Amino acid sequence: TINGIPDVYWLINNKSIWIELKSNDVKNCGLSKYQINWHLTHFKNGGQSFILREDLSQRSSKNLQIFVVREPRDLVLKFRDLDLRDAFKKILTQ
């Protein structure tokens, strides 16, 4: 596989979306430098990609967070406290 390529490729309604899946509470969601570079390059070339993380500090069903990677190599929290259905709806409307 290519270093840094996300876990999920989703093609829906003429949209091409990449999603990296994480389940941790570490800084930077535990993304490697290769993953960060992949997301930045993809974004700079007009692509859409997201990091979908399970917030392990939450015990509810609404424990998902959505992040994006932006310059200068920053991880930006876009949405929080989502269940899986709402997370996919948010990703589709971006």
Regions found by a protein language model. Give the residues of each.
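Active-site-adjacent loop/helix micro-motif of nuclease/hydrolase catalytic cores
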Residues: D25-I36
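Beta-rich catalytic cores
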Residues: G4
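Nucleic-acid nuclease catalytic cores
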Residues: F43-D74
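Charged phosphate-binding loop/patch that engages nucleotide di/tri-phosphates or the phosphate backbone
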Residues: K78-Q94
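Conserved catalytic cores of phosphodiester-cleaving nucleases, focusing on short active-site segments
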Residues: V8-W10, K15-D25
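A short acidic/basic microdomain associated with nuclease active sites
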Residues: T1
